Amino acid sequence: MRYTVALTGGIGSGKSTVADAFADLGITVIDADIIARQMVEPGQPALNAIAEHFGSELIAADGTLRRRALRERIFSHPEEKAWLNALLHPLIQQETQQQFQQATSPYVLWVVPLLVENRLYQKANRVLVVDVMPETQLIRTMQRDDVTREHVEHILAAQATREARLAVADDVIDNNGAPDAIASDVARLHASYLKLASQFVSQEKP
């Protein structure tokens, strides 16, 4: 298994910005959210199963999934959320493993929004948390997704707390300030991860 740095953070924390900065340095990025979206693209078996289970009104005229409608449908129905997870999780896991096998960089950045909730930090060699104040998360997400404050507060309440994420962190990027600061933080961490990955490889050799 390649040396793995798991990247996590709450909604609106700036995970994608940080992941893009690592990708610019030539690091393979495996993003759980992107894989999950790919699983429900038109023509994918999972999308057909969702349409059958929830009804064709969840499919837009262009054949794509109406994500917001699905989120609203499962938000207050735990049994429907469980059904969706049972459908998607094995597919996501399979695709994730395949991407790990195809990775070519010295280490892999594995972006997992629900790293703490699903205890997936146990599968990584190191955990990097993008940290922001809850109020910043609210404002950024409201602007980005064009949703109400109440909607974002519901999502935040369902996610792991800031304290729970920081408790499993080996490294932290503070993203409360200007986005320009991220590049220097990522460059510093990248140098450190290259050393750790190199040590990991030498330890693994018989």
UniProtKB/Swiss-Prot annotation:
The keyword Cell division does not apply. GO terms for cellular component: cytoplasm. Its main location: cytoplasm. It catalyses: 3'-dephospho-CoA + ATP = ADP + CoA + H(+). Its EC number is 2.7.1.24. The keyword ATP-binding applies. GO terms for biological process: coenzyme A biosynthetic process. Residues 4-200 form the DPCK domain. Pathway: Cofactor biosynthesis; coenzyme A biosynthesis; CoA from (R)-pantothenate: step 5/5. GO terms for molecular function: ATP binding; dephospho-CoA kinase activity. NCBIfam families: dephospho-CoA kinase (TIGR00152). Catalyzes the phosphorylation of the 3'-hydroxyl group of dephosphocoenzyme A to form coenzyme A. This is Dephospho-CoA kinase. It comes from Salmonella paratyphi A (strain ATCC 9150 / SARB42).
